[in-house]
Amino acid sequence: GIFLDKLKNFGKDVAGILLKKASCALSGQC
């Protein structure tokens, strides 16, 4: 339903932010 869709989108956003932070930290470009 709507709740699960929102949860999935939220999870994607969080995962994307974490991935950006991780790649930024690994490349040392923070």
UniProtKB/Swiss-Prot annotation:
GO cellular component term of the entry, any: extracellular region
Keywords assigned by UniProt, alphabetized: Antimicrobial, Disulfide bond, Secreted
An individual GO BP term: defense response
Expression across tissues: Expressed by the skin glands.
Disulfide-bond pairs as recorded: C24-C30
InterPro entries membership: Antimicrobial_frog_2
A Pfam match: Antimicrobial_2
Record's subcellular location: Secreted
Top-level taxon of origin: Eukaryota
Functional note: Antimicrobial peptide.
Family recorded in the similarity comment: Belongs to the frog skin active peptide (FSAP) family. Brevinin subfamily.
Name assigned to this protein: Brevinin-2Rj
